[in-house]
Protein backbone atom coordinates (compact mmCIF):
# COMPACT_ATOMS: atom_id res chain seq x y z
CA UNK A 1 0.00 0.00 0.00
CA UNK A 2 2.82 2.38 0.91
CA UNK A 3 4.47 1.64 -2.43
CA UNK A 4 1.30 2.57 -4.33
CA UNK A 5 1.02 5.84 -2.39
CA UNK A 6 4.66 6.64 -3.13
CA UNK A 7 4.12 5.96 -6.85
CA UNK A 8 1.04 8.18 -6.89
CA UNK A 9 2.98 10.94 -5.19
CA UNK A 10 5.73 10.66 -7.77
CA UNK A 11 3.20 10.88 -10.62
CA UNK A 12 1.61 14.00 -9.10
CA UNK A 13 5.06 15.60 -8.79
CA UNK A 14 5.92 14.84 -12.42
CA UNK A 15 2.54 16.17 -13.56
CA UNK A 16 3.06 19.36 -11.57
CA UNK A 17 6.54 19.83 -13.09
CA UNK A 18 5.50 19.07 -16.68
CA UNK A 19 4.01 22.46 -17.53
CA UNK A 20 6.85 24.56 -15.99
CA UNK A 21 9.47 22.41 -17.76
CA UNK A 22 7.55 22.67 -21.05
CA UNK A 23 7.33 26.46 -20.72
CA UNK A 24 11.04 26.70 -19.87
CA UNK A 25 11.95 24.52 -22.88
CA UNK A 26 9.83 26.60 -25.26
CA UNK A 27 11.34 29.77 -23.81
CA UNK A 28 14.87 28.44 -24.27
CA UNK A 29 14.12 27.47 -27.89
CA UNK A 30 12.72 30.95 -28.58
CA UNK A 31 15.82 32.56 -27.07
CA UNK A 32 18.09 30.39 -29.23
CA UNK A 33 16.08 31.16 -32.38
CA UNK A 34 16.15 34.88 -31.58
CA UNK A 35 19.90 34.71 -30.93
CA UNK A 36 20.43 32.94 -34.27
CA UNK A 37 18.35 35.53 -36.16
CA UNK A 38 20.16 38.45 -34.50
CA UNK A 39 23.58 36.89 -35.19
CA UNK A 40 22.73 36.26 -38.83
CA UNK A 41 21.41 39.83 -39.30
CA UNK A 42 24.60 41.20 -37.72
CA UNK A 43 26.78 39.08 -40.02
CA UNK A 44 24.80 40.16 -43.09
CA UNK A 45 25.18 43.82 -42.11
CA UNK A 46 28.96 43.32 -41.86
CA UNK A 47 28.87 41.72 -45.29
CA UNK A 48 27.03 44.68 -46.86
CA UNK A 49 29.47 47.14 -45.31
CA UNK A 50 32.43 45.43 -47.01
CA UNK A 51 30.93 45.14 -50.50
CA UNK A 52 33.21 46.18 -53.38
CA UNK A 53 31.84 47.29 -56.76
CA UNK A 54 33.57 46.24 -59.98
CA UNK A 55 34.16 48.28 -63.13
CA UNK A 56 30.92 46.94 -64.61
CA UNK A 57 28.94 48.32 -61.67
CA UNK A 58 28.24 44.87 -60.25
CA UNK A 59 29.13 43.67 -56.77
CA UNK A 60 32.35 41.68 -56.66
CA UNK A 61 31.98 38.18 -55.29
CA UNK A 62 34.22 37.20 -52.41
CA UNK A 63 35.57 33.64 -52.62
CA UNK A 64 37.20 32.41 -49.42
CA UNK A 65 39.29 29.30 -48.77
CA UNK A 66 39.57 27.99 -45.21
CA UNK A 67 43.11 26.62 -44.95
CA UNK A 68 44.70 27.34 -41.52
CA UNK A 69 48.02 25.78 -42.60
CA UNK A 70 48.36 27.30 -46.07
CA UNK A 71 52.14 27.73 -45.66
CA UNK A 72 52.74 24.00 -45.11
CA UNK A 73 54.36 22.08 -47.92
CA UNK A 74 52.05 19.10 -48.35
CA UNK A 75 49.73 17.84 -51.05
CA UNK A 76 46.76 19.61 -49.47
CA UNK A 77 48.48 22.95 -49.98
CA UNK A 78 49.17 22.12 -53.61
CA UNK A 79 45.42 21.55 -54.05
CA UNK A 80 44.75 24.97 -52.48
CA UNK A 81 47.09 26.89 -54.77
CA UNK A 82 46.03 25.05 -57.93
CA UNK A 83 42.35 25.55 -57.06
CA UNK A 84 42.96 29.27 -56.52
CA UNK A 85 44.85 29.55 -59.79
CA UNK A 86 42.08 27.81 -61.74
CA UNK A 87 39.32 29.99 -60.25
CA UNK A 88 41.30 33.17 -60.91
CA UNK A 89 41.56 32.20 -64.57
CA UNK A 90 37.79 31.60 -64.86
CA UNK A 91 36.38 34.26 -62.49
CA UNK A 92 38.79 37.15 -62.92
CA UNK A 93 36.62 39.80 -61.22
CA UNK A 94 36.17 37.97 -57.93
CA UNK A 95 38.01 38.81 -54.71
CA UNK A 96 39.97 35.85 -53.33
CA UNK A 97 40.62 35.30 -49.63
CA UNK A 98 42.55 32.69 -47.65
CA UNK A 99 41.84 32.22 -43.94
CA UNK A 100 45.15 31.12 -42.40
CA UNK A 101 46.78 30.78 -39.02
CA UNK A 102 50.33 31.27 -40.32
CA UNK A 103 50.94 34.49 -38.37
CA UNK A 104 54.71 34.05 -38.25
CA UNK A 105 55.14 34.76 -41.98
CA UNK A 106 54.11 37.59 -44.28
CA UNK A 107 51.78 37.38 -47.28
CA UNK A 108 54.76 37.73 -49.60
CA UNK A 109 56.60 34.88 -47.88
CA UNK A 110 53.57 32.60 -48.22
CA UNK A 111 53.24 33.32 -51.95
CA UNK A 112 56.99 32.91 -52.49
CA UNK A 113 56.85 29.62 -50.61
CA UNK A 114 54.09 28.33 -52.88
CA UNK A 115 56.15 29.30 -55.93
CA UNK A 116 59.31 27.65 -54.57
CA UNK A 117 57.71 24.42 -53.35
CA UNK A 118 55.02 23.84 -55.95
CA UNK A 119 56.13 25.94 -58.90
CA UNK A 120 52.78 27.80 -58.72
CA UNK A 121 52.32 31.54 -59.20
CA UNK A 122 48.93 33.26 -59.02
CA UNK A 123 47.88 35.65 -61.77
CA UNK A 124 45.77 37.88 -59.48
CA UNK A 125 46.11 39.15 -55.89
CA UNK A 126 44.86 37.15 -52.93
CA UNK A 127 43.96 38.56 -49.53
CA UNK A 128 45.08 36.76 -46.38
CA UNK A 129 42.98 36.82 -43.21
CA UNK A 130 45.29 35.87 -40.35
CA UNK A 131 43.57 33.95 -37.55
CA UNK A 132 44.63 34.11 -33.90
CA UNK A 133 43.05 30.91 -32.58
CA UNK A 134 44.65 28.23 -34.77
CA UNK A 135 45.93 26.48 -31.66
CA UNK A 136 42.36 25.27 -31.09
CA UNK A 137 42.66 22.87 -34.03
CA UNK A 138 46.05 21.46 -32.99
CA UNK A 139 45.87 17.78 -32.02
CA UNK A 140 48.32 18.40 -29.17
CA UNK A 141 45.74 20.69 -27.54
CA UNK A 142 43.45 17.70 -26.94
CA UNK A 143 45.21 14.70 -25.34
CA UNK A 144 41.82 12.96 -25.11
CA UNK A 145 38.72 13.21 -27.35
CA UNK A 146 40.96 14.66 -30.04
CA UNK A 147 38.45 14.37 -32.90
CA UNK A 148 35.71 16.14 -30.97
CA UNK A 149 38.07 18.76 -29.56
CA UNK A 150 39.57 19.67 -32.93
CA UNK A 151 36.14 19.76 -34.56
CA UNK A 152 34.66 22.08 -31.94
CA UNK A 153 37.86 24.12 -32.04
CA UNK A 154 37.42 24.51 -35.80
CA UNK A 155 33.97 26.03 -35.18
CA UNK A 156 35.53 28.67 -32.91
CA UNK A 157 38.27 29.29 -35.49
CA UNK A 158 35.63 29.44 -38.22
CA UNK A 159 33.66 32.00 -36.22
CA UNK A 160 36.77 34.17 -35.97
CA UNK A 161 37.20 33.86 -39.74
CA UNK A 162 33.55 34.69 -40.44
CA UNK A 163 33.57 37.80 -38.26
CA UNK A 164 36.72 39.08 -39.98
CA UNK A 165 35.47 38.52 -43.53
CA UNK A 166 32.03 37.36 -44.72
CA UNK A 167 32.40 35.73 -48.15
CA UNK A 168 29.83 34.93 -50.80
CA UNK A 169 31.41 31.56 -51.51
CA UNK A 170 33.17 29.53 -48.84
CA UNK A 171 35.39 26.54 -49.63
CA UNK A 172 36.87 24.36 -46.90
CA UNK A 173 40.01 22.93 -48.49
CA UNK A 174 41.51 21.32 -45.40
CA UNK A 175 38.86 19.04 -43.95
CA UNK A 176 37.20 21.16 -41.27
CA UNK A 177 33.64 20.02 -42.03
CA UNK A 178 32.23 21.47 -38.79
CA UNK A 179 32.70 24.97 -40.25
CA UNK A 180 30.31 24.24 -43.14
CA UNK A 181 26.97 24.78 -41.31
CA UNK A 182 28.42 27.89 -39.65
CA UNK A 183 29.18 29.59 -42.96
CA UNK A 184 26.03 28.28 -44.65
CA UNK A 185 23.38 29.07 -42.05
CA UNK A 186 24.96 31.93 -40.08
CA UNK A 187 27.07 33.45 -42.86
CA UNK A 188 24.51 32.88 -45.61
CA UNK A 189 27.25 31.62 -47.97
CA UNK A 190 27.33 29.09 -50.74
CA UNK A 191 29.58 26.40 -49.27
CA UNK A 192 31.78 23.79 -50.86
CA UNK A 193 34.56 21.51 -49.68
CA UNK A 194 37.46 19.48 -50.98
CA UNK A 195 37.87 16.40 -48.79
CA UNK A 196 41.35 14.90 -48.61
CA UNK A 197 40.53 12.46 -45.84
CA UNK A 198 37.34 11.92 -43.81
CA UNK A 199 37.73 13.01 -40.19
CA UNK A 200 36.33 9.63 -39.20
CA UNK A 201 35.89 6.55 -41.37
CA UNK A 202 34.40 3.08 -41.24
CA UNK A 203 37.96 1.74 -41.10
CA UNK A 204 38.61 3.68 -37.89
CA UNK A 205 35.49 2.15 -36.36
CA UNK A 206 36.72 -1.29 -37.42
CA UNK A 207 40.11 -0.70 -35.77
CA UNK A 208 38.45 0.13 -32.44
CA UNK A 209 35.90 -2.68 -32.77
CA UNK A 210 38.64 -5.25 -33.37
CA UNK A 211 40.78 -3.73 -30.56
CA UNK A 212 43.84 -3.10 -32.76
CA UNK A 213 46.49 -0.64 -31.55
CA UNK A 214 47.33 2.10 -34.08
CA UNK A 215 48.47 5.73 -33.96
CA UNK A 216 44.83 6.81 -33.34
CA UNK A 217 43.97 3.94 -30.98
CA UNK A 218 46.24 3.81 -27.93
CA UNK A 219 47.33 0.41 -26.60
CA UNK A 220 45.75 0.99 -23.17
CA UNK A 221 42.37 1.39 -24.91
CA UNK A 222 42.79 -1.49 -27.37
CA UNK A 223 43.76 -3.79 -24.48
CA UNK A 224 40.66 -2.90 -22.43
CA UNK A 225 37.27 -4.21 -23.68
CA UNK A 226 35.28 -1.66 -21.65
CA UNK A 227 37.30 1.33 -22.88
CA UNK A 228 37.14 -0.03 -26.44
CA UNK A 229 33.34 -0.24 -26.20
CA UNK A 230 33.09 3.31 -24.83
CA UNK A 231 35.38 4.62 -27.57
CA UNK A 232 33.30 2.79 -30.17
CA UNK A 233 30.13 4.52 -28.89
CA UNK A 234 31.97 7.86 -28.98
CA UNK A 235 33.09 7.22 -32.56
CA UNK A 236 29.58 6.24 -33.69
CA UNK A 237 28.05 9.37 -32.16
CA UNK A 238 30.77 11.51 -33.73
CA UNK A 239 30.20 9.83 -37.11
CA UNK A 240 26.49 10.76 -36.97
CA UNK A 241 27.29 14.42 -36.24
CA UNK A 242 30.06 14.43 -38.87
CA UNK A 243 27.59 13.08 -41.40
CA UNK A 244 25.15 15.92 -40.70
CA UNK A 245 27.70 18.78 -40.89
CA UNK A 246 29.18 17.36 -44.08
CA UNK A 247 25.77 17.09 -45.72
CA UNK A 248 25.41 20.87 -45.36
CA UNK A 249 27.87 21.36 -48.22
CA UNK A 250 26.41 22.47 -51.56
CA UNK A 251 29.36 21.00 -53.47
CA UNK A 252 31.52 18.10 -52.30
CA UNK A 253 34.76 17.18 -54.02
CA UNK A 254 36.85 14.21 -52.91
CA UNK A 255 40.32 13.20 -53.97
CA UNK A 256 40.08 9.46 -54.56
CA UNK A 257 37.90 6.39 -54.93
CA UNK A 258 38.63 5.44 -51.32
CA UNK A 259 37.58 8.83 -49.94
CA UNK A 260 34.52 8.86 -52.22
CA UNK A 261 33.25 5.56 -50.78
CA UNK A 262 33.70 6.68 -47.17
CA UNK A 263 32.16 10.11 -47.69
CA UNK A 264 29.11 8.55 -49.36
CA UNK A 265 28.74 6.21 -46.37
CA UNK A 266 28.88 9.10 -43.91
CA UNK A 267 27.42 12.14 -45.70
CA UNK A 268 24.99 10.35 -48.04
CA UNK A 269 25.05 13.09 -50.72
CA UNK A 270 25.81 11.16 -53.91
CA UNK A 271 24.23 13.78 -56.20
CA UNK A 272 26.56 16.50 -54.87
CA UNK A 273 29.75 14.45 -54.59
CA UNK A 274 32.38 14.00 -57.28
CA UNK A 275 35.94 12.68 -57.51
CA UNK A 276 38.49 15.35 -58.42
CA UNK A 277 41.96 13.84 -58.38
CA UNK A 278 44.44 16.26 -56.79
CA UNK A 279 46.87 18.15 -59.04
CA UNK A 280 50.28 16.61 -59.44
CA UNK A 281 53.00 18.55 -61.21
CA UNK A 282 53.60 15.70 -63.62
CA UNK A 283 54.87 17.96 -66.41
CA UNK A 284 57.74 19.31 -64.32
CA UNK A 285 59.23 15.83 -63.89
CA UNK A 286 59.00 14.74 -67.52
CA UNK A 287 62.39 16.24 -68.39
CA UNK A 288 64.12 13.72 -66.13
CA UNK A 289 65.91 11.19 -68.32
CA UNK A 290 64.80 7.69 -67.36
CA UNK A 291 67.88 6.11 -68.95
CA UNK A 292 70.23 7.86 -66.51
CA UNK A 293 69.39 5.19 -63.92
CA UNK A 294 71.07 2.46 -65.94
CA UNK A 295 74.52 2.21 -64.38
CA UNK A 296 74.38 3.88 -60.98
CA UNK A 297 76.75 2.89 -58.17
CA UNK A 298 74.55 4.00 -55.26
CA UNK A 299 70.80 3.36 -55.02
CA UNK A 300 68.79 5.93 -53.10
CA UNK A 301 65.36 5.18 -51.66
CA UNK A 302 63.31 8.36 -51.31
CA UNK A 303 60.17 9.07 -49.29
CA UNK A 304 58.00 12.19 -49.75
CA UNK A 305 55.43 13.17 -47.12
CA UNK A 306 54.84 15.51 -44.22
CA UNK A 307 56.25 14.33 -40.90
CA UNK A 308 52.89 13.38 -39.41
CA UNK A 309 52.24 10.23 -37.33
CA UNK A 310 49.92 8.63 -39.90
CA UNK A 311 52.68 8.70 -42.53
CA UNK A 312 54.39 5.94 -40.50
CA UNK A 313 58.01 6.92 -41.13
CA UNK A 314 59.20 4.41 -38.46
CA UNK A 315 57.97 1.62 -40.77
CA UNK A 316 60.18 3.01 -43.55
CA UNK A 317 63.24 3.10 -41.30
CA UNK A 318 62.64 -0.40 -39.92
CA UNK A 319 62.00 -1.82 -43.40
CA UNK A 320 65.24 -0.24 -44.66
CA UNK A 321 67.10 -1.76 -41.71
CA UNK A 322 65.62 -5.17 -42.60
CA UNK A 323 66.67 -4.68 -46.24
CA UNK A 324 70.28 -4.01 -45.25
CA UNK A 325 70.40 -7.39 -43.47
CA UNK A 326 69.62 -9.30 -46.66
CA UNK A 327 72.57 -11.02 -48.35
CA UNK A 328 71.54 -9.84 -51.80
CA UNK A 329 72.13 -6.22 -50.80
CA UNK A 330 75.51 -6.68 -49.10
CA UNK A 331 77.45 -5.45 -52.15
CA UNK A 332 75.07 -2.57 -52.93
CA UNK A 333 75.47 1.01 -51.75
CA UNK A 334 72.09 2.07 -50.38
CA UNK A 335 70.75 5.17 -48.66
CA UNK A 336 67.33 6.24 -47.39
CA UNK A 337 66.23 9.87 -47.82
CA UNK A 338 63.13 11.13 -45.99
CA UNK A 339 61.76 14.35 -47.52
CA UNK A 340 58.87 16.18 -45.89
CA UNK A 341 57.38 19.29 -44.37
CA UNK A 342 57.12 20.22 -40.69
CA UNK A 343 54.03 22.24 -39.73
CA UNK A 344 54.81 22.85 -36.06
CA UNK A 345 56.95 21.93 -33.04
CA UNK A 346 55.17 18.59 -32.76
CA UNK A 347 56.32 17.61 -36.26
CA UNK A 348 59.87 18.79 -35.52
CA UNK A 349 59.92 16.66 -32.38
CA UNK A 350 58.78 13.72 -34.48
CA UNK A 351 61.75 14.22 -36.82
CA UNK A 352 64.07 14.16 -33.81
CA UNK A 353 62.53 10.85 -32.70
CA UNK A 354 63.00 9.41 -36.20
CA UNK A 355 66.66 10.45 -36.19
CA UNK A 356 67.04 8.75 -32.82
CA UNK A 357 65.44 5.56 -34.18
CA UNK A 358 67.74 5.45 -37.23
CA UNK A 359 70.74 6.02 -34.96
CA UNK A 360 69.68 3.17 -32.66
CA UNK A 361 69.34 0.85 -35.66
CA UNK A 362 72.69 2.05 -37.00
CA UNK A 363 71.46 2.81 -40.51
CA UNK A 364 72.20 5.78 -42.82
CA UNK A 365 69.13 8.01 -43.14
CA UNK A 366 69.10 11.55 -44.53
CA UNK A 367 66.36 13.99 -43.47
CA UNK A 368 65.36 16.82 -45.81
CA UNK A 369 62.86 19.12 -44.08
CA UNK A 370 60.91 21.89 -45.87
CA UNK A 371 63.25 21.84 -48.85
CA UNK A 372 62.56 23.87 -52.03
CA UNK A 373 61.06 22.25 -55.11
CA UNK A 374 64.34 22.27 -57.08
CA UNK A 375 66.07 20.18 -54.42
CA UNK A 376 63.10 17.81 -54.21
CA UNK A 377 63.27 17.25 -57.96
CA UNK A 378 67.01 16.57 -57.81
CA UNK A 379 66.58 13.84 -55.20
CA UNK A 380 63.78 12.21 -57.18
CA UNK A 381 65.82 12.28 -60.38
CA UNK A 382 68.57 10.29 -58.64
CA UNK A 383 66.33 7.82 -56.77
CA UNK A 384 65.79 4.18 -57.63
CA UNK A 385 62.80 3.55 -55.32
CA UNK A 386 60.04 5.87 -54.11
CA UNK A 387 58.78 4.75 -50.69
CA UNK A 388 55.33 5.29 -49.15
CA UNK A 389 54.00 3.65 -45.96
CA UNK A 390 50.78 5.38 -44.86
CA UNK A 391 47.89 3.03 -44.15
CA UNK A 392 44.73 4.06 -46.02
CA UNK A 393 46.35 7.12 -47.60
CA UNK A 394 43.50 9.11 -49.13
CA UNK A 395 45.42 9.64 -52.37
CA UNK A 396 49.17 10.25 -52.41
CA UNK A 397 50.49 13.15 -54.49
CA UNK A 398 54.02 12.21 -53.49
CA UNK A 399 53.48 8.78 -55.03
CA UNK A 400 52.44 10.29 -58.37
CA UNK A 401 55.44 12.64 -58.32
CA UNK A 402 57.75 9.69 -57.70
CA UNK A 403 56.25 7.79 -60.63
CA UNK A 404 56.44 10.81 -62.95
CA UNK A 405 60.08 11.37 -61.96
CA UNK A 406 60.97 7.80 -62.87
CA UNK A 407 61.38 6.14 -59.49
CA UNK A 408 59.91 2.70 -58.97
CA UNK A 409 57.17 3.22 -56.42
CA UNK A 410 56.64 0.96 -53.42
CA UNK A 411 53.44 2.06 -51.66
CA UNK A 412 51.14 0.82 -48.91
CA UNK A 413 48.66 -1.80 -50.04
CA UNK A 414 45.56 0.20 -49.08
CA UNK A 415 43.52 3.33 -49.81
CA UNK A 416 44.16 5.54 -52.82
CA UNK A 417 47.53 4.02 -53.81
CA UNK A 418 45.93 0.60 -54.13
CA UNK A 419 42.67 1.72 -55.80
CA UNK A 420 43.72 4.66 -57.98
CA UNK A 421 47.47 5.02 -58.48
CA UNK A 422 49.61 1.88 -58.35
CA UNK A 423 47.37 -0.03 -60.74
CA UNK A 424 48.22 -1.75 -64.04
CA UNK A 425 48.46 0.55 -67.05
CA UNK A 426 47.44 -1.13 -70.29
CA UNK A 427 47.89 -4.41 -68.40
CA UNK A 428 51.51 -3.59 -67.49
CA UNK A 429 53.09 -3.21 -64.04
CA UNK A 430 53.51 0.35 -62.71
CA UNK A 431 54.85 -0.28 -59.20
CA UNK A 432 54.61 -2.42 -56.08
CA UNK A 433 52.55 -2.61 -52.87
CA UNK A 434 53.40 -3.82 -49.35
CA UNK A 435 52.01 -3.60 -45.81
CA UNK A 436 54.62 -4.76 -43.27
CA UNK A 437 58.33 -4.49 -42.46
CA UNK A 438 58.96 -7.89 -44.04
CA UNK A 439 56.95 -7.28 -47.21
CA UNK A 440 58.50 -3.83 -47.73
CA UNK A 441 62.01 -5.21 -47.30
CA UNK A 442 61.24 -8.09 -49.66
CA UNK A 443 59.77 -5.76 -52.30
CA UNK A 444 62.77 -3.39 -52.15
CA UNK A 445 65.09 -6.37 -52.43
CA UNK A 446 63.16 -7.61 -55.49
CA UNK A 447 63.30 -4.19 -57.18
CA UNK A 448 67.04 -3.87 -56.59
CA UNK A 449 67.61 -7.35 -58.06
CA UNK A 450 65.85 -6.46 -61.32
CA UNK A 451 68.00 -5.69 -64.34
CA UNK A 452 68.27 -2.02 -65.39
CA UNK A 453 66.17 -2.87 -68.47
CA UNK A 454 63.39 -4.40 -66.35
CA UNK A 455 63.35 -1.37 -64.05
CA UNK A 456 63.25 0.95 -67.07
CA UNK A 457 60.14 -0.80 -68.43
CA UNK A 458 58.31 -0.32 -65.12
CA UNK A 459 59.39 3.34 -64.97
CA UNK A 460 58.09 4.00 -68.46
CA UNK A 461 54.73 2.35 -67.71
CA UNK A 462 54.40 4.34 -64.48
CA UNK A 463 55.20 7.66 -66.13
CA UNK A 464 52.62 7.12 -68.86
CA UNK A 465 49.97 6.10 -66.31
CA UNK A 466 50.11 9.30 -64.22
CA UNK A 467 49.11 11.69 -67.02
CA UNK A 468 45.56 11.50 -65.64
CA UNK A 469 46.74 13.30 -62.48
CA UNK A 470 48.14 16.41 -64.19
CA UNK A 471 47.46 20.03 -63.22
CA UNK A 472 45.41 20.47 -66.38
CA UNK A 473 43.10 17.56 -65.53
CA UNK A 474 42.63 18.90 -62.00
CA UNK A 475 41.78 22.42 -63.17
CA UNK A 476 39.17 21.18 -65.64
CA UNK A 477 37.52 18.86 -63.11
CA UNK A 478 37.69 21.36 -60.22
CA UNK A 479 36.05 24.11 -62.29
CA UNK A 480 33.31 21.76 -63.50
CA UNK A 481 32.55 20.51 -59.98
CA UNK A 482 32.62 23.94 -58.28
CA UNK A 483 30.52 25.67 -60.95
CA UNK A 484 27.22 25.33 -58.98
CA UNK A 485 28.71 27.59 -56.29
CA UNK A 486 29.00 30.44 -58.80
CA UNK A 487 25.56 30.12 -60.41
Swiss-Prot record:
Lumenal face of the membrane: 1-16
Q: Does the keyword Zinc-finger apply?
A: no
Identify the enzyme class: transferase
**Taxonomic lineage:** Eukaryota, Metazoa, Chordata, Craniata, Vertebrata
Pathway terms, separated by semicolons: Protein modification; protein glycosylation
Organism's domain of life? Answer: Eukaryota
Identify its protein family: Belongs to the glycosyltransferase group 1 family. Glycosyltransferase 4 subfamily.
List localization entries.
Endoplasmic reticulum membrane
Q: What is its EC number?
A: 2.4.1.131
Q: Report the protein's function.
A: GDP-Man:Man(3)GlcNAc(2)-PP-Dol alpha-1,2-mannosyltransferase that operates in the biosynthetic pathway of dolichol-linked oligosaccharides, the glycan precursors employed in protein asparagine (N)-glycosylation. The assembly of dolichol-linked oligosaccharides begins on the cytosolic side of the endoplasmic reticulum membrane and finishes in its lumen. The sequential addition of sugars to dolichol pyrophosphate produces dolichol-linked oligosaccharides containing fourteen sugars, including two GlcNAcs, nine mannoses and three glucoses.
Record has Transferase as a keyword = yes
Going by the UniProt record, its keywords in alphabetical order are: Endoplasmic reticulum, Glycosyltransferase, Membrane, Transferase, Transmembrane, Transmembrane helix
> What are the annotated GO cellular component locations?
endoplasmic reticulum membrane
**Ranges lying in the membrane without crossing it:** 232-252, 395-415
Instruction: State the annotated membrane topology for this chain.
Output: Single-pass membrane protein
Which residues point to the Cytoplasmic side?
A: 38-231, 253-394, 416-487
MF terms from GO for this chain are: GDP-Man:Man3GlcNAc2-PP-Dol alpha-1,2-mannosyltransferase activity
Name of the protein: GDP-Man:Man(3)GlcNAc(2)-PP-Dol alpha-1,2-mannosyltransferase
Query: What's an example Gene Ontology biological process for this entry?
Result: dolichol-linked oligosaccharide biosynthetic process
> Matching Pfam families, A to Z?
ALG11_N, Glycos_transf_1
Q: Which residues cross the membrane?
A: 17-37
What is the species listed in this Swiss-Prot or TrEMBL entry?
A: Xenopus tropicalis (Western clawed frog)
Write out the catalysed reaction.
an alpha-D-Man-(1->3)-[alpha-D-Man-(1->6)]-beta-D-Man-(1->4)-beta-D-GlcNAc-(1->4)-alpha-D-GlcNAc-diphospho-di-trans,poly-cis-dolichol + 2 GDP-alpha-D-mannose = an alpha-D-Man-(1->2)-alpha-D-Man-(1->2)-alpha-D-Man-(1->3)-[alpha-D-Man-(1->6)]-beta-D-Man-(1->4)-beta-D-GlcNAc-(1->4)-alpha-D-GlcNAc-diphospho-di-trans,poly-cis-dolichol + 2 GDP + 2 H(+)
Amino acid sequence: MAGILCLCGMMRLLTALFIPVLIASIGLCLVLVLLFICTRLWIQRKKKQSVEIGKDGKKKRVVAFFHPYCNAGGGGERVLWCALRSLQKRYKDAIYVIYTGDKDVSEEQILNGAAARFNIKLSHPVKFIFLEKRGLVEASFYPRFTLLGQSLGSVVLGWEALTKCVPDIYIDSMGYAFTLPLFKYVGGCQVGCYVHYPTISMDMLSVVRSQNARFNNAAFISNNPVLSRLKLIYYYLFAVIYGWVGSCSDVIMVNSTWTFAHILDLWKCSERTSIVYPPCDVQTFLDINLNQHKDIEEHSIVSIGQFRPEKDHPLQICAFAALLKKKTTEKLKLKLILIGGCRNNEDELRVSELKKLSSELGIPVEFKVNIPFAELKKHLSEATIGLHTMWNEHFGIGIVECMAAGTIILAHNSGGPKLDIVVPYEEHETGFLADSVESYAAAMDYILCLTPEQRLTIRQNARRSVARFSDQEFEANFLASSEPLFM
